[in-house]
Curated annotation (Swiss-Prot):
Transmembrane segments: none annotated. Belongs to the class-I aminoacyl-tRNA synthetase family. MetG type 1 subfamily. GO terms for molecular function: ATP binding; metal ion binding; methionine-tRNA ligase activity; tRNA binding. CDD domains: Anticodon_Ia_Met, MetRS_core, tRNA_bind_EcMetRS_like. This is Methionine--tRNA ligase. Zn(2+) binds at C145, C148, C158, C161.
Amino acid sequence: MTEARKILVTSALPYANGSIHLGHMLEYVQTDMWVRYQKLRGNQAIYVCADDAHGSAIMLRAEKEGITPEQLIDGVRAEHMADFADFGVDFDNYHSTHSQENRELSASIYLALRDKGHIATRAVTQYFDPEKGMFLADRFIKGSCPKCGAEDQYGDNCEKCGATYTPTELKNPRSAISGAVPVLKESQHFFFKLPDFEAMLKQWTRSGALQEAVANKIAEWLDGGLQEWDISRDAPYFGFEIPGEPGKYFYVWLDAPIGYMASFKNLCSKRPELDFDAFWGKDSTAELYHFIGKDIVNFHALFWPAMLEGAGYRKPTAVNVHGYLTVNGQKMSKSRGTFIKARTYLDHLNPEYLRYYYASKLGRGVDDLDLNLEDFVQKVNSDLVGKVVNIASRCAGFIHKGNDGLLVAANPEPELWDAFQAAAPSIAEAYEARDFSRAMREIMALADRANAWIADKAPWALNKVEGKQAEVQEICALGINLFRQLVIMLKPVLPKLAADAEAFLNVKPQTWADLSLPLANHQLNPFNPLLTRIEPAKIEAMVEASKEDLAAEASKPQGNGELAKDPLAAEINFDAFAAVDLRIALIEKCEFVEGADKLLRLSLDIGDEKRNVFSGIKSAYPDPSKLEGRLTLYVANLAPRKMKFGISEGMVLAAGPGGEEIYLLSPDSGAKPGQRVK
């Protein structure tokens, strides 16, 4: 007998900042199917995961909701676990990266890397939000694209033209958190010296640990030269403080993959028979597999194996990469109702339908998978209801009515039984290779053969013929045994259907080894419908509910609440707006106005003319000389106003509620005095 394999399997850790959607579920379902197959074969397969619970995004969301980060991640984790459980994703352990195990492992791995000379420190200059008192990650900086000029773009790439750039290249940068203009500030950062592991990575990435397409992409990065990886962030930050470095925290992507180890270590504390080092030690003979999406390949195929190597741990056996999910041929869309949360799906449909559809489309490659909702309905109704379950529903009634539910010992078609037996190794091979679509095709081909044979024998017709009842029982006995084989083969994909079928068949939980053992002279339990057809109306209701989710989110207070404080004015037509002559003005001189509590006097250059303006911005600019030399926006055709202190010839533009919160508006660099604002 072959010795059972020791296998540890992980999926990427979902971020503890939002709900699970069907795109996420693609990964967890396929991982779960592979683990269930391994367990069905008698292997020791252990599936661990955790919530990725650190980072600025979590800290800021908790602050916005008026709760602690710990309260936020605890609530999200409970939601995630409920969604996974209801989808049949059966983790052996589901933990959190905000755990004592992860804190200890992250510290020990960092210290091992540092002590071996793989950590560097140097000063970096990055944007700092003076209002929030925090350094800004690229995604928390917005401005105009330096290439195409598109506004409201992130600090690292333009969603309009696709350009990539550094935050310092962004035009008119602002903090996406507070709206403040960020300032450049220097800070000491810690770097993992990834180039130290270039030779090892070149060998490991070509060892069969990656799919060929992924290995080819990694080779491009390796050929381009590896860079040191910034593994630190400055306070305030929700995460683990770097040992011996007050105010410095591990970047979330350092402790996130260590979360795989931490979750397994947590499981070891619950199951004493498990040995942490037997799975993670340098000389471990266990197998280690990571299932991930193609968007995080660089972390898992470069940084992670290098960290493990440097800290004295084993490397993954393989990193299995999959593509993205599209719906109806397009990116998931909230407005179209195709950005479907796992819970919204569960409110309308059986999760096993989607598990089967994903399996029918998942191959070994990294291509995207399309959830075509019309095809989904057709495939589930045709394959699961019309083929697999149909065999049992055709045969069970005759056995219960004609023989009190007793399955006779008979095999009236040995060739068909043998064909099922002969197909099992190929189906097993497809499961092992994660070629789930091939496995489903081969299983459905067997279901077609079984249905065709039963249709040819027509037990419903024979049952009406005197003296043919025994033959009917033999036909239906083989039909039920073929159904049982199909259920065992589908058990990794459809665990709930398998459990319900096992209850009907009156058998213990089946394993792959049970495929070769037919039931004979065996009492069945009453048959109840195992699956029902999908009604298109349920799909429509799910899509509409997903749109409602969007509407509900849209109704929540968004942004900074400024519009609620000061609602938008009544709509005007274009001619009314065009009548306002906005110009660029240079502030040549700015000074206090004697006897005025709120006013500053601004002497403006608008190109060919000079203008004098009084503006109520004194409270925000206690040193008016600092405004001199600045460009601002000026209403040039506003009728002059006679004031106590002189005549004001127009108005400069500023934003803010008043007091110290007044912000004089400025144009982009390159604008010239006198130019019209359009």
